[in-house]
């Protein structure tokens, strides 16, 4: 919100604008923009493509070198003592505790009897990370047993993520199951196996209970025995169900140390036999020790887990460091149907790869260049086709007869439109005739549209326009409004040469203006909508209570709309700023700190002006769709002007149906919320909400109702309550506006007439109006919702005397003529010649009807008396 004191003052006839040079649109720095020719920057395009190709080469070489390094690492053995493995540096702590008293490691501990040995032939077994056509369907059993509750929250999500990564290739024919030490029943986990990619699996993962993964508190001091019972449970499950698919893998995730396992004699004695049975059942087993580095203690770990190999993926039981899996997920992947191994490439041939690099990179670069060239040609072809369709945008003098005919139609319709605007007779404007010239057409190019408007009479030369980008008047989602100055005669007065308009902000041929422009992030659709708004403002015409466009700049990259400057900003902020400065009585004094104070009469006057502006829009068959206090602007003299026509549409039928977009929910009627149907009657509903905003001094409508509940609230009969400062007569109009059926709502010209009657044109006292009624010259008043006592006031024109009955007499019939004469003078001084006639006609008709009614009543009384 801007303040009147911030207005730029121009004292001299030729003011200096040197301090605003950076805001000029004719500034060379701002005029420079990227060339529209896609072939003008061939060198730059080629440099970009060359750099892109170079990046691809570097990345490819790095990836290949990394893969070669991994392939030459070979199988890991238990004798490796290095602190790194496969290029991965381990950062986890070695163990959580030192060896206990009950742990005795026997270096001569042998592997279990009859344990299968991998022979090197890939057809003998289904292993993780190996592609095989015989290993398409898998049963993945994930056993999670954790000891430390502090790490459960971090360990469980990482386990789920690992399982997801290693089973991406599994189809719905493969199955997965989870097993925990604390299950609801002994066989519950065993009976729950889920197909991959099923809703049941998704629900199971969503309902994953971390607490089930912890060992029982009774096993807190004997974690090795807990592992024994857990493996026994898994083995019983295997004996019960078996593996009916091509292969099976058992992933055991634990944060126990090998020392915890070693301290349990039961585990140490039973593990070899348990492992042998699991392998004979068709499982390959992998132990994942979470948050541990077993590099330095791999011999001890292999001794505890007899038959398992440390970091050897080609064994039936593998001991895995948890830190290694994230760097090499392919080595643990299952359900790979091809015959080629994915984890480690056999017989890697660097010379073949080098040859592929030499041949492939140039081919890829050439392909990219061809695609870029094709895209450039396609865009240029589309641009030429658009310009051929709209031949009026071409400066070529050699045109065929069809092109000349289309150009003549364009020029003829433009001249007719300008002539109708000058004569004020453009009410019957048919937008369908302008359909292939309108800026909202999707096929029109923005550049061509801008070229069409360059020689338009509404255009402002950028040399005569200064934009103060450091003086932001307002901003929204799709546009920013800045203060600016227009030099010379404004296009609005050129188009409407008969318009005798006085601009408040004019000073020696320089006009203060509000300049609307698109933000930097605006896309092509925003530009098209902006040009649509420019076209709408041209067709809108001039009205004292509707914001007028002074001119425009049809720059395709930075179009501008120049409108009237309203010093007091939007009505909503104005009301909230003066919320505490409303004088309820004539004798009240305005506080010293207030820049101005308002009376109820001022609020009624603003409401009348908005109704007048909306009546004009309705007469032009325009629907606003966003009538609210935030979109009403106030000039320095408190003249209200309807603005913001971004959602405004031309109504060529009884209803306009919206197709989407952002809409003001709490200002919308029932049919607009329910069916997205808009008409003048929906604007009437919004006008009722606007009246609530005015007389509540800027309160938010329906503050306790959510937007999604608005339709239900309105259908249930919910409406806004009467504001404290709202007269009963105004609230009656508001209630009429909120009728559920559109046909029951009043027209804007009807409401304008009612508010005209309410306006006190002769008395500045608060709350009292002088009007004529059908029953004779009586005195009515604006009554507040909590007022009990009222007082009369004088009627415009003439003097009144109180008769014996306490009624006011307005005099003879000749007094009506005196009233209209005085009313004529007051209207001319207050509202100008343009609005005088309509208001005068309303008052005179009311006076004439009341006098005729009085005569009929008098004659009827005399006849009754005589009879």
From Swiss-Prot:
Membrane-related topology note: Multi-pass membrane protein
Record field: compositional bias (Polar residues) = 858-867
The Protein kinase domain covers 467-757
Which GO cellular component does the record give, naming just one?
A: plasma membrane
Q: What is its main location?
A: membrane
Gene3D superfamilies xrefs: Phosphorylase Kinase, domain 1, Transferase(Phosphotransferase) domain 1
Q: Which InterPro entries match?
A: Kinase-like_dom_sf, Prot_kinase_dom, RTK, Ser-Thr/Tyr_kinase_cat_dom, Tyr_kinase_AS, Tyr_kinase_cat_dom
Q: Which Gene Ontology terms describe the biological processes this protein takes part in?
A: cell surface receptor protein tyrosine kinase signaling pathway
Which top class of enzyme applies to this chain?
transferase
Catalytic activity reads: L-tyrosyl-[protein] + ATP = O-phospho-L-tyrosyl-[protein] + ADP + H(+)
- On the tree of life, the source organism's domain of life is Eukaryota
Establish whether keyword RNA-binding is in the entry: no
* Region Disordered, annotated ranges: 782-821, 848-867
Active-site residues per Swiss-Prot or TrEMBL entry = 626 (proton acceptor)
This protein's record includes keyword Glycoprotein: yes
Q: Which residues form the signal peptide?
A: none
- What GO molecular function terms would the record report? ATP binding; transmembrane receptor protein tyrosine kinase activity
Q: What EC number is given for this enzyme?
A: 2.7.10.1
List of glycosylated residues: 395, 423, 496, 500, 585, 859
Keywords noted in UniProt: ATP-binding, Glycoprotein, Kinase, Membrane, Nucleotide-binding, Receptor, Transferase, Transmembrane, Transmembrane helix, Tyrosine-protein kinase
The record's comment on protein family reads: Belongs to the protein kinase superfamily. Tyr protein kinase family.
* PANTHER family per record: TYROSINE-PROTEIN KINASE F09A5.2-RELATED (PTHR24416:SF624), TYROSINE-PROTEIN KINASE RECEPTOR (PTHR24416)
Query: What protein name applies here?
Result: Putative tyrosine-protein kinase F09A5.2
Q: Which organism is it from?
A: Caenorhabditis elegans
